[in-house]
Amino acid sequence: MSELKLDPYFGEYGGMYVPQILMPALKQLETAFVEAQQDPEFLTEFHDLLKNYAGRPTALTLTRNLSPNPKVKIYLKREDLLHGGAHKTNQVLGQALLAKRMGKKEIIAETGAGQHGVATALACALLGLKCKVYMGAKDVARQSPNVFRMRLMGAEVIPVTSGSATLKDACNEAMRDWSGSYDRAHYLLGTAAGPHPFPTIVREFQRMIGAETKAQMLEKEGRLPDAVIACVGGGSNAIGMFADFIDEPSVKLIGVEPAGKGIDTPMHGAPLKHGKTGIFFGMKAPLMQDAHGQIEESYSISAGLDFPSVGPQHAYLNATGRATYESATDDEALEAFQLLARSEGIIPALESAHALAYALRLAKDATEEQIIVVNLSGRGDKDIFTVSDILDGKASA
């Protein structure tokens, strides 16, 4: 570990729990990242892409009708307005540029609902990189519009039939491919989890979310918000929002995990509050496990939060008490999804609706004037059929 330039741990969490064959690839990636962060040319190109291709800075919108309490202002950080429809475009552009700088010709990625796959495909099309996306066969069947989008942009989508044929199996196949091809390929991981240096790279390529929010807040209100709230699956949109506020003790950092059918049922995805520390996906982190230490399937109405572990920096922020992690059920997220659409004319991603649901709960109970910022991490186009089917089912029940 002495050869590393950055600390691979956040407290006891993180690390590089990978086969020896991948250590040179991770060390090479860390070196390239550190050098790129000090290279004005790289940073200029990254910021130019964010501004002129992706559409940054994104708006900070004060909701007009959403808040249930006149004392509480609810602002939305509008990552849903970003090209590609979600926060994922930020760090994908950063990693793809980094891969190009390293001389890689090919990108390997995994995807569940297809959002990360679509973001990766658009970055590869833009930068002239070959793109291979591993996707569980079940997800390929469920997410045909995103599969078509990826293929339309030139990506090769590879259905994975092993195991449960879902995201974790796609991750395994992508990692296996990378272990034999890292001389020419970069594995573009989709969240702030996995082995070092991925959690740090993803945070740094997402931190403009919080940096912009801070500047916009000071301009609009002349002060910082009382709380910033974001949903947490692997944790990339949340760490992007939190990073610039960690050293601002007056600002509460609140992450919202998916409570699914209820925290007291096996049908949830809240490892931070209800998991045990273990080794998974190349890192030491809280993990949903059964009594025998086997990984339990996570569950959420939103595919993007359906992850049995969480990024190591979130585990550390939780352990130290700097951030608080709450949860919202499927039903609460569905209610918030519909409420935002009806009250503000904005359809959020189901993932973001979890953060919104908790913000509404917090606002309702407030007795003093407060300003809350919710990271609206993505738009809800991808979720309209899921929500429509659920609401139709409830109506006919």
Swiss-Prot record:
UniProt-listed Enzyme Commission number(s): 4.2.1.20
Keyword terms: Amino-acid biosynthesis, Aromatic amino acid biosynthesis, Lyase, Pyridoxal phosphate, Tryptophan biosynthesis
Top-rank lineage group of the source organism: Bacteria
Modified residues (N6-(pyridoxal phosphate)lysine): K88
Enzyme kind, highest EC tier: lyase
Pathway: Amino-acid biosynthesis; L-tryptophan biosynthesis; L-tryptophan from chorismate: step 5/5
Signal peptide: none
Molecular function terms, GO-annotated: tryptophan synthase activity
Cofactors (names): pyridoxal 5'-phosphate
Catalytic reaction(s) noted: (1S,2R)-1-C-(indol-3-yl)glycerol 3-phosphate + L-serine = D-glyceraldehyde 3-phosphate + L-tryptophan + H2O
GO CC aspect terms: cytoplasm
CDD domains linked: Trp-synth_B (cd06446)
InterPro entries reported for this sequence: Trp_synth_b_CS (IPR006653), Trp_synth_beta (IPR006654), Trp_synth_beta/beta-like (IPR023026), TrpB-like_PALP (IPR001926), TrpB-like_PALP_sf (IPR036052)
A Pfam family this chain is assigned to: PALP
NCBIfam families documented for this protein: trpB (TIGR00263)
Record-linked PANTHER family: TRYPTOPHAN SYNTHASE (PTHR48077:SF3), TRYPTOPHAN SYNTHASE-RELATED (PTHR48077)
Description of how the protein assembles with itself and partners: Tetramer of two alpha and two beta chains.
Protein family membership: Belongs to the TrpB family.
Function recorded in the entry: The beta subunit is responsible for the synthesis of L-tryptophan from indole and L-serine.
Protein name: Tryptophan synthase beta chain
